[in-house]
Amino acid sequence: MRWALARSPGGTGDMARSLKKDETAIDQWVAGDGAPTFRQAQKLAKLLRVPFGYLFLEEPPDEEVPIPDFRRHPTSTNPSLDLRDVISDVLRKQDWYREHRVERDEEPIEFVGRFTSGSDIRVVADDIRSTLDFETAVRPESPADAFLRAFVAQVEAAGVLVMRNGVVRQATNRALRVEEFRGFSIADPMAPVVFVNNADSNAAQVFTLAHELAHIWIGQGGISDADVTIGGEGSGDIEEFCNEVAGELLLPWAAMSERWRQRTGGFEDWTSVIARELHVSTVMVARQLWQHEAIDRQQFFDFYEHEKQNWTSKQSTSTGGNYYLSAPIRNSRRLTQSVLESVEASETSIREASRLLGVKPANLTKLEESMGVG
């Protein structure tokens, strides 16, 4: 029971309120000084989202995460129930899409695992750029949210499913915490996937997407911090490598260094200008300067701490807006279209499509119309 409570997003207080008991009673159950009734145990198992029998195990079950965990942040812990459920949901969708492609005799995607974490950073970034037809020069013409959408569209056009959500499926009461993870990837050549925690700001999501693409390109998917403070240590760590590739993709040093040499204002003003133009964070700009020794480590971390103090909450767990526009964002537009086309071809049942996309069967037709399918 202690294990089940520890992995639950709520604490003892939440359980006590749901069961209409005092917290001391819950504490006694955990300590073995008392026991819930059969009905209370059933309700407790449902609240904690565990099989009923798990509450009475002497040892916690071994719950392996099905994808590698590359997180390095000091606060990183065992993946929460929310993160585990998101990974399971994404793997279910990825499995359907993989089978869908295999049945059509489609070829594996060549760039998945094309490089290794020992490859040249600039070469990997350039390959991603050319594969996606990613052109940084067009960014000043677009607002930040439009650039993020365009970036996602480019990635999906290349064959990678991109799913963005800030909650577990459609459960708005189960918000995903940026402090726990920013994204993860599945580097399957038949069905590569990137999941981005869109509880984060647009600029942070851009970096996370670029970071996860680096994981795809080296064939090592997993859970990521996508923390811009990781780097500059030359450790050969995968997260550090992917950060450096993301930095070079979004802020190519050859062009950035020239502007740095020609700057007229101060360091902080300059980073703000570049960040606004290219839809990245100011800390991301400063990180590139630190990475290429234009500023030292102390300057970078002083700036980072200063920016942290000034951050207002840019995070949002809202899934509001147009229901039919948000569904392809959560599920990947490419996957959504494939599922709907499969339904039209009588290859996938309406029930299965509804389960995969988290859309009521009665709303699938409207979703088709909104996407121009059929």
Kindly give the residue locations of the regions a language model identified.
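Active-site hotspot residues in diverse enzymes, especially metal/ion-binding acidic/histidine motifs
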Residues: 1-374
